[in-house]
Every structure is written in structure tokens, then in C-alpha cells.
């Protein structure tokens, strides 16, 4: 064994979680190293070439507000941008971009190379070193030993990876990367409760083999409506490519069903549990038998490649069946598969074995992030990576760690769900998972999280100055709207010009903006646009004014819940001695060890009656094991 150095924080893996973890730890001043099997796989997109989407776009904005990298990378490498759910309320608006996967990798690799205090190593980590229940370092396949105060596991689907295509399988990570089998055994030996999950990816096909005249075109939003992910991005945006939509048909479904037993998922070869909200095409055909078609989104992988990604058509069927069912689709009759679809099975940890800081309860100083924690998706991974890296660094430096309550962010909701409720299948963030989604909008992520990022050392001076300036602009415009009166004649003229039924009378601009038919641009046509108010800020201001009553109600809910969050539970509380609890509640509370009464009430199987009993016991005084 060759001792090659010591670090405050070591990050294993340089995918979306590992990048944010390494960047966050180094930004906080911790001496940091990130290990990856290949420098050419940093920030790889082994599945869809896109960032954002419903709820995921909010996670990216939150990452950016805290000082993360993903938003800037997406803004620098996007090909097409669309705001999803524009016909619905602002709570579910979601930015999504197609990205150039090669340029995204290059951006992220360079971002890490430019990060001060961060060492980048191409090496496979085969084991962690643990002493007296605390991580002490890692060992590589070349017998290199590196000491560390804290380690972040961000292994993606490489950990114990196994790829399936029909009845063929082989040990591998995604995109031909090695499987990290030795590390799995080391983590098991350290006492981590591991399990098997599964995910999949569709075929990549050659652009020239698609008849686009048979597909529906899916353009991006008009250039003047485009919004960046990062609060720091000022560059003008324009769409560069179009996406397309194809549809399966009854013949496609017949081919799949006739060969369903050749799928390793249905033939019993795959043990791992797949994602509920991103099913394979064979799953869709079986589970939704009454549907006669399913959409397939045809997306470019980059500007300098002819590979096209078939979103919505992941599969693990044999190659001959893939050829047959893809070619049964209108526009795909002559399809050329460049990379076949496959399923991948991998190891991950039971997230209820983690603290809300993402530190392991089994091995102190060891943190998890991304798919290792049982989630799916680049955005979920990156968000956890930032939190794990931040907390690993603060732990190593002897500082207080950050716990984000679920009412602060989608990231806080995600982590609370993982460590409190656990997962039965790969976890995907959705707006419906948050009870505070009107407050946790993508447009106000900076207001919610940038001060926290500043307090914990992640937000640098340029971002902080930008945040303060933005808040000053919004505050000034809110005051102007509150103080400005519109004459009835002027308002009616503006409404008639916009094709709207004229209002009865004028009034204070702020009060008028509460009306559903009146928009900020309409008012601005009368009183002028506020100084430095962009369309993006105008939309944010309008949302806050129009929904002020609902937001205030949600704020009251948050304050009520916060009282339970402040009722702390001793780590050694003797649940088994509390006879008023149900047996299920006692078992789950003893296993998960919630930090406070609020978290206890969110554990599945713990009823309001159990929470009341626990509250009484806590008020009565110490009850320890």
C-alpha cells in the first residue's frame, strides 16, 4: 500500500452529484479530491441529454441559488429551451433545456479544473478505510492510499453495475464504463445496508435514418421568452435545434408483447426495482394495455453528432426485437441503431440509514449523494451532491452542518423524504411531493436560499452582490406599484387595446394587479416599466402580488409545522418503553431515529395519535435507552 496524500474531503465519482460535492467542498476551503474512473466521463449524460423539467427545473434553480454549477453549465451548453406547464399555475412552471452532452462534459471538466483547492484523480476507488466507526480514507485499484476526514459516495449506477440486453448481461457501468464491484463489497463490510435498483435507457439512432416529415415538430419557446437557469446568466438566449415527437402504434405493441418473455425484466433475470415514473416501453405496453399509442420524443444529443435520443422508449429487449419494434413506428421504418437500449442494475443504500445532512449513521464522516441514495435523475443527484459536499467540508473543518427543512426548498423536501420515508423504487422529485409548492417556486429560489448559501460559505461575493441588487429592484418596484394610481380612462384604454373587457374603474396599481385579467405588461403600458425590471422579474413580481393571500396562508402553515420541527428528540430516546405507541410506530421510530417531532410525524406508519403520545412523553422529561 502506497500512502499518496491526505485530504479533508474525498469525493468518489464525478457525475452530476460528484461534481457539485467536490465543487462545494473545495469552495468552502476544504482540501478536496475527486476520484473518477475516467476524466472523459466527468459530467457524463448516460441517459437523456437534457436538464430540468417538472420539479427538476426548480432543483436546478435552487442549486444555482446556493452556489452550485449545474445551472451555469446548462445555460452555457443548451440547444433548445422550453418552459413547461405554462398553461398552469406558477407553482408548477418548469424550465427544461436540451443540452449538448459533449459540451456539457467539457464545461464541467473545466469547471472542476478551475476550482481552487480541488485535486482531480483518474482512478477507481476499491475500498473505504474505516476505524472505530469513522471513515479514514480510501484505497484505489493501484494500491494507492489516501487519507480523508470525510468521504462522499457519488457512484451513480457504476456501483455493482450490471447491464442487460435481452438474455445477455455483463458487468458494467453506463456508456461502457467499468462496474465498481470491489467498492460494493467494502461498503457492505462497513455495515451499510445496500439494495439493488434498476434503470434503463433507450437506443441512440442515426439522424439520417429518421423521416422527420412523418413526425411532429416540437420547437422551443420564442427566443424573447427564454429564461436562464442561473441567476448569474445575462447572455441573450436563442434556440438552436428542434425536437420531434413520434408515436408507437398497435403493431409496435404487438411486437413487444410477442417477445415480452425475452425481456430480462419479465424473464426474471433482473432483481433490482425500476423507476415508477420512468417505465420502459415494455412496461408501458403491459401496464397501460388500453392505450393504443405512446409518445417518443426525438432529441438531438449535440450539435456535432448525428446521434438522436429516443426519450420515452427505454428497453431491455434483445437487439433484434428493438430493431423490429422501433422500425414499426411511423418515420422510423429505416432506423439505424447506433447504441442499443439497455437496462442497468446497480447497488444503492437504504436512505433511512442517513442523517438529514446525508451523513451515514453507520460510518461517521461518510456521506451519500445521488443514485447511491436511491434517487433517479441528474438534477436530484446534483442537488444532493451540493448538500453532501457542503456538509462533508463543514464536518471536516469542525463547523456546523446544514439541514434544510422541507419548507425551505425542493432539496429539503427531497432529503426529508429520503431519510424519513425511505424509498421502494428510484425516487424522482415531483411538484406533488411538496406541500409548499406555491412558496417553493423556481422564480424565487434565490430569495429562499442565497442567504443560506452565504451564511454557510458557498455563495461568493459576485453572486451575493447580484442577489442584493435583484432584491433592491423588486422592493423598489413593489413600492412604486403600491404608490401609483391609475386613472379609469387610462386603464380602460389599455384593456381595450389588449382586447379585454374594460374594468369599472382605476385604482392603485398593486391592487389592480391582483385581478386575474390584468398583467404587469398591461399596467406597464400605462405607467411604464419599472427601472431594471426584466420580463422574468415582472412575472415573479406579478405572481407574488396575485397569489399573496395563498402565499400568506402557506406561510402560516409553515410556521405551525416549524413548532414541531423545534421539538427535538434525544438520539437515545427509549421508544420501546413508550407503551402508548403502536408496535409499528415503535419499530420505525427506533430504526429511523427522527431528530424532531415533525420528522417523526412524517414517517410512514406513525399516526397523529403516536405523535401526540410522543409529544406528551417529551414534555414529561428524559426517557433514555
Language-model-derived ranges and their functions:
Residues 3-17:
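Beta1/beta-strand and adjacent pyrophosphate-binding region of the FAD-binding site
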Residues 5, 141-150:
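Core beta-strand elements of the Rossmann-like FAD/NAD(P) dinucleotide-binding domain
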Residues 23-127, 131, 142, 154-171, ...:
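Conserved N-terminal/central alpha/beta ligand/cofactor-binding core
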Residues 38-40, 56, 83, 184-323, ...:
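An anion/pyrophosphate-binding glycine-rich loop and adjacent beta-alpha core
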Residues 150, 155-159, 317, 330:
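Glycine-/small-residue-rich beta->alpha transition segments that form the dinucleotide
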Residues 309-375, 403-416, 534-588, 593:
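A glycine-rich dinucleotide-binding beta-alpha-beta segment and adjacent secondary-structure elements
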Residues 381-402:
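Internal hydrophobic alpha-helix adjacent to the cofactor/substrate pocket in enzyme cavities
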Residues 433, 439-441, 445, 450-612, ...:
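Extended, charge-enriched "interface" segments that sit outside catalytic cores
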Amino acid at each position: 500500500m502506497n500512502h499518496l496524500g491526505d485530504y479533508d474531503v474525498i469525493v468518489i465519482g464525478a457525475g452530476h452529484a460528484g461534481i457539485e460535492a467536490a465543487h462545494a467542498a473545495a469552495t468552502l476551503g476544504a482540501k478536496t479530491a475527486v476520484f473518477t474512473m475516467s476524466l472523459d466521463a466527468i459530467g457524463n449524460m448516460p441517459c437523456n441529454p437534457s436538464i430540468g423539467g417538472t420539479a427538476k427545473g426548480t432543483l436546478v434553480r435552487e442549486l444555482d441559488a446556493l452556489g452550485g454549477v449545474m445551472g451555469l453549465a446548462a445555460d452555457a451548453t443548451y440547444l433548445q429551451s422550453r418552459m413547461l406547464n405554462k398553461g398552469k399555475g406558477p407553482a408548477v412552471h418548469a424550465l427544461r433545456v436540451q443540452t449538448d452532452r459533449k459540451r456539457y462534459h467539457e464545461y464541467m471538466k473545466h469547471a472542476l479544473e478551475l476550482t481552487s483547492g480541488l485535486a482531480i484523480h483518474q482512478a477507481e476507488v476499491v475500498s473505504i478505510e474505516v476505524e472505530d466507526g469513522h471513515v479514514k480514507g480510501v484505497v484505489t485499484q493501484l494500491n494507492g492510499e489516501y487519507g480523508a476526514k470525510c468521504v462522499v459516495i457519488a457512484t451513480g449506477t457504476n456501483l455493482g453495475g450490471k447491464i442487460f440486453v435481452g438474455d445477455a448481461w455483463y458487468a458494467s457501468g453506463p456508456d461502457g464504463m467499468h462496474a465498481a464491484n470491489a467498492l460494493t463489497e467494502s461498503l457492505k463490510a462497513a455495515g451499510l445496508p445496500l439494495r439493488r435498483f434498476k434503470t434503463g435507457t433507450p437506443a441512440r439512432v442515426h439522424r439520417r435514418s429518421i423521416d422527420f416529415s412523418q413526425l411532429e415538430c416540437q420547437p422551443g419557446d420564442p427566443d424573447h421568452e427564454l429564461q436562464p437557469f442561473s441567476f448569474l446568466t445575462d447572455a441573450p438566449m436563442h434556440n438552436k435545434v428542434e425536437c420531434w415527437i413520434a408515436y408507437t402504434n398497435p403493431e409496435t405493441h404487438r411486437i413487444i408483447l410477442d417477445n415480452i418473455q425475452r425481456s430480462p425484466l419479465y424473464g426474471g433475470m433482473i432483481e433490482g426495482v425500476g423507476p415508477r415514473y420512468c417505465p420502459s416501453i415494455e412496461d408501458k405496453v403491459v401496464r397501460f394495455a388500453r392505450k393504443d399509442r405512446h409518445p417518443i420524443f426525438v432529441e438531438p444529443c449535440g450539435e456535432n453528432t448525428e446521434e438522436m435520443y429516443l426519450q420515452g422508449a427505454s428497453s431491455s429487449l434483445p437487439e433484434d426485437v428493438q430493431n423490429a419494434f422501433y422500425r414499426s413506428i411511423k418515420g422510423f421504418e429505416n432506423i439505424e441503431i447506433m447504441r442499443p437500449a439497455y437496462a442497468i442494475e446497480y447497488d444503492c443504500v437504504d436512505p433511512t440509514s442517513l442523517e438529514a445532512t446525508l451523513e451515514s449513521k453507520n460510518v461517521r464522516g461518510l456521506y451519500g449523494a445521488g443514485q447511491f441514495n436511491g434517487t433517479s435523475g441528474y438534477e436530484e443527484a446534483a442537488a444532493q451532491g451540493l448538500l453532501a459536499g457542503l456538509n462533508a467540508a463543514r464536518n471536516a473543518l469542525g463547523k456546523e452542518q446544514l439541514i434544510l427543512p422541507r419548507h425551505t426548498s425542493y432539496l429539503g423536501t427531497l432529503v426529508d423524504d429520503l431519510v424519513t420515508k425511505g424509498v421502494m423504487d428510484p425516487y424522482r422529485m415531483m411538484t406533488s411531493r411538496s406541500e409548499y409548492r406555491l412558496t417553493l417556486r423556481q422564480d424565487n429560489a434565490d430569495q429562499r436560499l442565497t442567504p443560506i448559501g452565504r451564511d454557510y460559505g458557498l455563495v461568493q461575493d459576485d453572486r451575493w452582490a447580484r442577489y442584493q441588487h435583484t432584491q433592491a429592484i423588486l422592493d423598489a418596484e413593489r413600492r412604486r406599484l403600491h404608490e401609483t394610481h391609475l386613472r379609469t380612462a387610462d386603464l380602460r384604454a389599455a384593456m381595450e387595446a389588449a382586447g379585454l373587457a374594460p374594468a369599472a374603474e382605476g385604482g392603485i396599481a398593486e391592487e389592480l394587479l391582483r385581478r386575474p385579467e390584468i398583467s404587469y405588461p398591461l399596467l406597464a403600458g400605462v405607467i411604464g416599466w419599472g427601472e431594471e425590471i426584466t420580463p422574468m422579474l415582472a412575472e415573479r413580481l406579478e405572481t407574488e402580488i396575485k397569489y399573496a393571500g395563498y402565499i400568506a396562508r402557506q406561510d402560516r402553515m409553515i410556521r405551525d409545522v416549524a413548532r414541531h420541527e423545534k421539538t427535538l428528540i434525544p438520539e437515545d430516546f427509549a421508544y420501546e418503553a413508550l407503551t402508548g405507541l403502536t408496535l409499528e410506530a415503535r419499530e420505525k421510530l427506533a430504526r429511523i431515529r427522527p431528530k424532531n417531532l415533525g420528522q417523526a410525524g412524517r414517517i410512514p406508519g406513525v399516526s397523529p395519535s403516536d405523535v401526540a403520545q410522543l409529544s406528551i412523553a417529551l414534555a414529561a422529561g428524559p426517557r433514555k435507552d
